[in-house]
Regions:
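Conserved class I S-adenosyl-L-methionine
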Residues: 1-44, 57, 81, 138-169
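C-terminal helical/coil "lid" or tail adjacent to the Rossmann-like core of SAM-dependent
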Residues: 204-253
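A short glycine-rich, Lys/Arg-flanked "PGG" loop and its adjoining helix->strand segment in the class I
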Residues: 123-138
C-alpha cells in the first residue's frame, strides 16, 4: 500500500491544488518555500526531483524558472492534476524511488517526511532521496514542528477542546486522534537534524520555513477567513508583515523553534 487509507481520505476531502493560494497562510508558506529554495537550487537548467509533490504547485514554479522537473506522489489524483499542468509526474512511493542513482541535481521532499509515521520509513525515504541526488546536490525536506498544534490551537481559541491531542503530539510527535491531518508525525529541531544525518548528507541546515511571522497568517485565517478583517489587520499588508518578520528571524537561530514548519537541507557528499 502506497498510502494509508485515512491519509488518502484526508486529501480526498481537500483540494491540495489551491491550498497554497486560497488562504493568507498558504500564500505565505508558498512565498517562503520559494525564497528558501532559491538559496540552494543550482542555476537552471538543472534536473529537480519533487518527491511527494502533490498536484505540482512547486513543480510548476520550478518549471517556469527553467528547471526540468520530475514529480512523484502516492495519490493518483494529485499525479493527474500535475500531468494536466504539463508536469512529468508518476505515482510512486518515497521509500522506493524509480530513478537511477545520482539522477537529479537537487531533490525536494516537501510531504513524505511528516506523513511517514514510522522512523524506519522516514530514514528509508531520506536514503532514497540522497541516492538519486548527484554529489554536491542538495536534498531539501519539510517537517512539522511539535509545538505547532499547541500555538495554533491557542490562536484559534481551541486549546481546551484539543488539549489531549496537542499534549500527545508534544509528548510523542504523533496522535492517532489528530483530526487536523491524519497519519502525521511532528519533529523537534534536534530530532530532525538527527534523522537527516548519516545518509551521505553533509552540512545539515534547518531553517524555519514559516518562522514566527507565520503565526500572524494562522490567526488571520482562523478568525477572518470568511469575513473582512479590521483595518488594523489589513494595512499594512499582513502578508508582507509576516514575510518581513520571518526574514528577520532567519538571522537568529534561537528563533527556529518559533516556526510551525521546518525546511531542512543537506548536501550530497
Amino acid at each position: 500500500m502506497l498510502i494509508d487509507t485515512a491519509l488518502e481520505a484526508h486529501y480526498a476531502e481537500r483540494d491540495e491544488n489551491v491550498r497554497l493560494t486560497s488562504t493568507v497562510k498558504g500564500q505565505f508558506e508558498l512565498a517562503r518555500m520559494q525564497h528558501l529554495l532559491g538559496q540552494y537550487l543550482p542555476d537552471p537548467p538543472a534536473v529537480v526531483g519533487d518527491i511527494g509533490g502533490g498536484p505540482g504547485t512547486h513543480a510548476r514554479w520550478l518549471r517556469d524558472r527553467g528547471y526540468s522537473v520530475e514529480l512523484l506522489d502516492p495519490i493518483p489524483h494529485h499525479v493527474a492534476q500535475a500531468r494536466a499542468a504539463g508536469i512529468d509526474a508518476c505515482v510512486g512511493d518515497a521509500r522506493k524511488l524509480p530513478w537511477e542513482d545520482e539522477y537529479f541535481d537537487a531533490v525536494l521532499m516537501a510531504g513524505p517526511l511528516y506523513h511517514l509515521t514510522c522512523l524506519e520509513d522516514r530514514l528509508t525515504a531520506l536514503q532514497e532521496a540522497t541516492r538519486v541526488t548527484r554529489p554536491g546536490g542538495f536534498v531539501a525536506v519539510v517537517a512539522l514542528n511539535r509545538t505547532a498544534n499547541l500555538i495554533g490551537a491557542l490562536l484559534a481559541n481551541e486549546l481546551q477542546q484539543r488539549q489531549p491531542v496537542v499534549q500527545e503530539i508534544l509528548d510523542t510527535g504523533f496522535s492517532p486522534a489528530n483530526d487536523r491531518m491524519a497519519e502525521t508525525t511532528y519533529h523537534t529541531v534536534s530530532q530532525l537534524r538527527q534523522e537527516m544525518s548519516g545518509h551521505g548528507l553533509r552540512s545539515i541546515t534547518v531553517h524555519g520555513l514559516t518562522g514566527p511571522g507565520g503565526w500572524l497568517t494562522v490567526a488571520l485565517d482562523a478568525h477572518f477567513h470568511h469575513q473582512q478583517p479590521p483595518a488594523t489587520l489589513t494595512d499594512p499588508d499582513p502578508l508582507q508583515t509576516a514575510l518581513t518578520c520571518s526574514r528577520i528571524a532567519d538571522r537568529f537561530p534561537e528563533l527556529l523553534p518559533a516556526s510551525s514548519q521546518f525546511f531542512a537541507v543537506g548536501q550530497r557528499a
